[in-house]
């Protein structure tokens, strides 16, 4: 994806500038840097952000290896990676409530995080 620049805003600029577009964030502390979470809320406004979990069925399970679509994933702490490539995220092992808590820990006001996790997706 091309970067957002002042002369060629690209897809990010188009998304921010289009009122009907919503931004979905996997706010697990792994997929997206906290500053990007804050910037997204600032650019789109709390009414246009949706928190999602991308939660795998290994969510809540202890660290270890788990089957995933004919492949194997490794869960270690809050991180799920492909067993054959530890640099590739397999998904998230954080619940939506955990994502909401992360958003608040990143500086998103509680009311905005609750809205993004409940009202906006509905």
Annotate each predicted stretch with a short phrase.
Residues 10-29, 36, 41-122:
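His/Asp/Glu-enriched, well-ordered alpha-helical/loop segment
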Residues 1-10:
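Divalent metal-binding pocket/active-site signature
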Residues 4-5, 30-33:
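A conditional alpha-helix N-cap/helix-loop micro-motif detector
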